[in-house]
């Protein structure tokens, strides 16, 4: 019995020495004037509760905004037209104007806003480019002669012809450049730059190197830029108005049709001429080509036009084509 007690005492003394050695090694790692023993922790610290976010309040605010918007949208339209010049647009359906009234309103806006009376009048058209069977109308460009021209500056026109007498006729009628294949390299090198390019039919096969360079300005029959009547073509392209579909928005066309100081009937006539030219680019039996039309000035908002009376009828176009022939 005494032997077992003696053995137990030795084990206890040895354990105390080992524990003292570990304590001294820990104190050497953290030198300080005051010794504070750090016990070994065998449990995880309790995590602090996360702060409550204001997600609920944000959702409530967004829901309230949605409710307000839905309430505004749910307001019924007022009957008739607004009696005053100042009114809430959401309470009335969008006004659709006849051309004459729209022009008069633009003139009235100019007086009230003290803007330039000679500012431009613009026509914005949204087009239906579908042809059926997954085909579309290609973006087009055209030049037309307006019934009441307003452009003061003449456009530069280059004439392609290999005939010396035709070159002389072109120069006498105001061509900026006239010549044959000798003009091709000069155009590729940007030595010659013109607003429009016209040609006689015989020289067309030799102009293929210019297709990529000129793009939509390359002479074509359907754009009236290829023909034999050089003086007539020069007159059209020097004084005519170019209209073309926007390159990015392929169903949108914007063009200047007049100045605001012109008489209302002249502005209306130019507008009708532009719409007739646009509608030539697509068969009428496929339905209306012009979907929406807005008339505006340089400083005013766009006024939605009543488009149905402006669209040409199929019988009218056939008669006009016969007269032209």
Swiss-Prot record:
Residues 56-66 have a biased composition (Basic and acidic residues). It comes from the Eukaryota. InterPro entries: Ribosomal_uL1-like (IPR023674), Ribosomal_uL1/biogenesis (IPR028364), Ribosomal_uL1_3-a/b-sand (IPR016095), Ribosomal_uL1_mit (IPR005879). Pfam families: Ribosomal_L1. One of its GO terms (biological process) is translation. Gene3D superfamilies: 3.30.190.20, 3.40.50.790. The keyword Aminoacyl-tRNA synthetase does not apply. This is Large ribosomal subunit protein uL1m. The gene is MRPL1.
